[in-house]
Design a protein with these regions (language model features):
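Metal-dependent peptidase/peptidase-like ectodomains
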Residues: 119, 232-296, 344, 398-537, ...
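Second-shell loop/turn segments in exported
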Residues: 44-52, 66-75, 144-149, 183-190, ...
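A conserved hydrophobic secondary-structure block that centers on an alpha-helix together
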Residues: 158-230, 234, 343, 356, ...
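C-terminal amphipathic alpha-helical interaction region
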Residues: 658-760
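Noncatalytic luminal/extracellular "stalk/propeptide" segments of secretory-pathway proteins
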Residues: 22-44, 51, 63-183, 214, ...
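Alpha-helical metal-binding/catalytic segments enriched in His/Glu/Asp
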Residues: 214, 334, 349-403, 408, ...
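Soluble metallo-hydrolase cores and metallopeptidase-like ectodomains found primarily
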Residues: 136-171, 247-361, 375, 379-383
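His/Asp/Glu-rich mid-to-C-terminal helical/loop segments that flank catalytic regions of hydrolases
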Residues: 392, 453, 506, 521-580, ...
Length: 760
């Protein structure tokens, strides 16, 4: 999962007082989805829950879980799973471990050598630090590598490609530089690491090296470890480079990786890279980059190393060798249920427990908070509280290699989840600072309401208001500030595929949230041996007060979701978000039409030739066909229907609550809840996205060339990115039909609720 960049926020006392006034709730206003009577009782249980969360317990959970390396297939990975299972059982959950068998390669041989014009061998190892005892667990640590890199042994000239995205290769084209037959070196950042070898291979490169530049997470940002919290000169970011065609086990797409599952051969697995890849430290990168010549890299390509950044190719000539043990390994998902009075509806909560090494931040900070939530839910249950809906806590294994545990579990239980799942709430890393949340916007009003009830440990204002004010301070322009101020809700970001929410949102069509705190910690050791208890307790959430805030936030959300009379959804923010996605498509089309028209004019005028510096020659950009008209009317019309249906449901819910939420039979409420649970499934199309059929959701999906980053309405957007305008246009009516189906589902729920209110 990606980590927070450091941001700073100053909050004036006047802003604080105004914020407090704005966020005060009217006592008589019931919670979303609750009757007035149920709302008051609910808030009492929620306050008991929040009061019972103990930071010292979260600290102890982290100390235990991160004590040793616990990657997939390691002894401590299984030991942690069994310990987590024992805790859930101790707290009164009905708990079990579900085991899957997945492909998980580990390194056998790794070589990066500079052969010409000088000789150098990369260390490819993070050193033991005397001040950090955990770093000495070398026998149990995974070496520095990129999982799912194909085996390979290649020697070639080196080319620097910045972050290695498609736009970077377009820039190389302008410089007249080809990577065909070369080994590329890219710096981490600006998207999923697996995109770097993918694009390099498509451009003809035969190998890929990825390094951590100090401008991204090293001494450029602050003192490096152990004096400060930032990545040291020999620190390396491990990570998967699996392609984005589908997440999960590469050999069992679309089915759970059980013992009986039919498996692809490794040769036929589409998500394994086409060229060999290795990560290196910035110390190992300096000798390689220093021996490049050719054009000086553009300004925005230059990192924080004390060298002149050249692009190449050569004269640096590099030997890259990768060989792995391609073995099947067991993964252990811990699934724990607190049964509700209605076992037919499920609220799910998850965080992964595996790590690349010790993983105090990623993922143990989130997992430790999850366990404290579960402990306190068990305590409430002993005091007499029983949730209406069943609550399922999930400690996933195998997230780091490619969301293996959550994907295989969802694929195995897909039919049950589609029938019973109300929502899924995810966490991963948790740090110090501001509330961050993403997800499906039908839960935007809900999570905003929850966040108003949680106190920020540094300011004592609500975490909702502190995050909102921070967003205003760091808004990119006046328009963004205006947009933030015009909304009473916390604006959810759109999720791609950075963590275990992916299968729930993109494959199963389940309403989803992912929640974290961050932005104020003093450094990062992302996927390094130094991401351990010693580092975390010095430089991140020292007193675990933000671990408590995370547990309070998500635990409150879980209780509120589980107890609501009606599933607490509000579709208006979702309709607004989808309208924004559609407007972005129209803007992209208009911008491309303008860009290509202007480019063709400048080519015709000879402007590029006239502006070319003969001492630093560049190649003119290619002639592009100006995009034709695209008919967005079907989608715009469908979105109008969606807005009207969302408004209708909001009015029906308000009327139900205004009438005192008359007592009705459980069966009638359950019928409406069944309607509501079905709505997010209507975003799915069984055929999936055009080039990636595993991804079923037609609104929410990661980009094929972004990974972590979302590409809303991907069926249209990605054809536009490929300049396949006719194909993009053909997708619009199909997406419009999906949106109309969603509107129809919301209208059904609204009509049933209107009927219920009229009856009483």
């Amino acid at each position: 999962m990606s980590f927070w960049g450091v941001v700073f926020c100053a909050i004036l006392s006047g802003q604080f007082l105004a914020a407090q006034a704005k966020e005060e709730k009217t006592p008589s206003t019931p919670l979303l989805g609750y009757s007035s009577q149920a709302s008051e009782k609910e808030q009492g249980w929620e306050q008991k829950f929040r009061d019972g969360i103990v930071p010292a317990n979260i600290r102890e959970n982290m100390r235990r879980l991160s004590a040793r390396p616990h990657h997939v297939g390691s002894p401590y990975d299984k030991d942690n799973a069994e310990w987590i299972l024992s805790k859930f059982k101790e707290w009164g959950f009905d708990a079990r471990i579900e085991t899957f068998n997945v492909l998980f390669p580990t390194p056998k041989e790794r070589v990066v050598e500079l052969l010409e014009p000088t000789k150098f061998s990369a260390k490819l190892q993070e050193p033991v630090l005397p001040s950090d005892a955990t770093s000495s667990q070398t026998a149990q640590q995974l070496p520095t590598y990129n999982a799912y890199s194909i085996d390979g042994d290649v020697t070639a000239p080196l080319v620097y490609v910045n972050h290695g995205n498609r736009e970077d290769y377009d820039r190389l084209d302008r410089l007249g530089i080809s990577v065909k037959g070369a080994i590329v070196i890219a710096r981490y950042g600006e998207g999923w690491r697996g995109i770097k070898p993918k694009v390099a291979g498509e451009r003809g490169a035969i190998g890929c090296i990825i390094y951590s530049d100090p401008k991204g997470d090293g001494y450029y940002r602050g003192d490096d470890y152990p004096e400060g919290g930032w990545r040291p000169r020999l620190g390396v970011q491990r990570g998967s480079v699996m392609d984005t065609d589908y997440p999960g086990d590469p050999l069992t797409p679309g089915v759970g990786a059980t013992a009986e599952a039919k498996r692809l051969t490794i040769r036929d697995a589409k998500t394994i890279t086409k060229i060999p890849v290795l990560p290196i430290s910035y110390s190992d990168a300096v000798p390689l980059l220093s021996e490049l010549r050719g054009p000086v890299a553009p300004d925005e390509w230059r990192g924080g190393l004390p060298i002149t950044y050249h692009v190449g190719p050569g004269p640096a000539k590099v030997h890259l060798k990768v060989s792995s043990n391609w073995e099947m390994k067991p993964i252990y998902d811990v699934i724990a249920t607190l049964h509700g009075s209605d076992d037919n509806e499920w609220v799910l909560r998850g965080n992964h427990h595996d790590a690349w090494v010790n993983g105090a931040d990623d993922p143990v900070s989130g997992q430790s908070a999850l366990l404290e939530e579960a402990r306190m839910l068990g305590e409430l249950h002993r005091q007499g509280w029983q949730p209406k809906r069943s609550i399922i806590y999930c400690a996933w294994d195998g997230e780091e290699p490619g969301l293996l545990g959550s994907v295989e579990w969802v694929e195995t239980h897909l039919d049950e989840l589609k029938k019973h799942a109300v929502a899924y709430i995810n966490s991963d890393s948790n740090e110090r600072g501001f509330l961050g949340a993403g997800g499906t916007q039908d839960l935007q009003s809900f999570i905003s309401s929850v966040a108003r009830d949680i106190r920020d440990p540094e300011t004592n204002m609500s975490v909702f208001q502190r995050s909102r004010l921070n967003s205003i301070v760091h808004a990119k322009d006046a328009e963004e500030r205006k947009n933030i101020r015009s909304h009473n809700d916390f604006l959810l970001s759109t999720l791609g595929d950075g963590s275990d929410y992916t299968a729930f949102q993109d494959y199963a069509g389940i309403s989803t949230l992912s929640v974290e705190f961050g932005g104020e910690n003093d450094g990062t050791q992302y996927h390094s041996i130094y991401d351990d208890f010693y580092w975390y307790t010095r430089f991140v959430d020292t007193d675990f007060v933000y671990g408590r805030a995370l547990a309070q936030t998500i635990g409150t959300a879980i209780i509120r979701l589980a107890d609501a009379d009606l599933v607490p959804v509000d579709y208006s923010p979702q309709a607004e978000a989808i309208a924004k996605y559609e407007a972005e498509l129209e803007k992209i089309l208009k911008d491309k039409q303008d860009e290509f028209t202007e480019r063709d004019l400048e080519l015709h005028e000879g402007a590029f030739a006239a502006a070319n510096d003969p001492r630093r020659p560049t190649v003119p950009p290619p002639v592009e066909v100006v995009p034709p008209y695209m008919n967005f009317a079907p989608m715009k019309n469908a979105i109008e229907l969606l807005k009207k249906s969302a408004e209708r449901y909001s009015k029906a819910l308000a009327a139900w609550q205004r009438e005192g939420s008359p007592a009705v039979s459980v069966d009638k409420l359950q019928a409406i809840n069944t309607d509501l649970i079905a709505v997010p499934r209507l975003f799915l199309a069984e055929k999936g996205l055009p080039a990636r059929p595993w991804f079923k959701n037609q609104i929410y999906a990661p980009g094929a060339y972004t990974g972590y980053g979302a590409k809303p309405i991907a069926a249209v957007r990605e054809y536009m990115d490929e300049k396949k305008w006719k194909e993009a246009d053909a997708q619009i009516p199909q997406v419009a039909q999906v949106i109309e189906n969603v509107a129809g589902g919301i209208n059904k729920a609204a009509a049933d609720l209107e009927s219920l209110t009229r009856e009483h």
